Regions:
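S-adenosylmethionine/decaboxylated-SAM
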Residues: 1-162
Length: 162
């Protein structure tokens, strides 16, 4: 995020807060990161880490269903990081593409799903959901994508200029 110096970052799936802390480091001077976690116990753990960070004032933690929370956040997002329930990736993507700022990007994590999405016969609901997401994004004329094959795979997605 430091390369873009974003003002508004949305993270879908906080878990322990590690990604949020990394993303918050690159925020612009008055930037804000909104992170959404559905599991209260994970959100509580992340909140403890956030409180220890010098960027705590730039991070707002939301607890609940991202599909309900996203529409309540009135921002154009410079960066959206999706790392939540794999079966929800397509719906999250469809929710945030219209909310991207000019030049904004979506980063989707775990898009290789342990290499399972590369197998000829994909099994398991999460692997099938990630494969469907990858195909959905690949075939979306609104965006351009780059797949980074590091670790478990990240998909960088940018909304095309119209």
């Amino acid at each position: 995020s430091g390369m873009k110096r974003p003002m508004h970052i949305l993270e879908i799936g906080t878990f322990t807060g590690y990604s949020a802390l990394c993303l918050a480091k690159g925020l612009g001077p008055n930037g804000k990161l909104h992170t959404i976690e559905n599991r209260k116990e994970d959100a509580d753990k992340a909140a403890r880490y956030f409180a220890q960070s010098h960027n705590a004032h730039k991070i707002e933690l939301h607890i609940g269903d991202a599909k309900e929370i996203i529409p309540t956040l009135p921002y154009k997002w410079d960066i959206v990081f999706i790392d939540a329930d794999k079966t929800g990736y397509i719906e999250y993507y469809e929710m945030v593409v219209p909310l991207l700022a000019t030049g904004g990007i979506i980063i989707a994590d775990n898009v290789l799903f342990h290499g399972e999405v590369l197998e000829e016969n994909i099994s398991g609901k999460n692997a099938m959901a990630v494969h469907a997401f990858n195909e959905h994004v690949k075939n979306d004329p609104r965006t351009s994508q780059v797949l980074l094959t590091i670790r478990d795979g990240m998909l960088l997605i940018q909304k095309n200029e119209l």
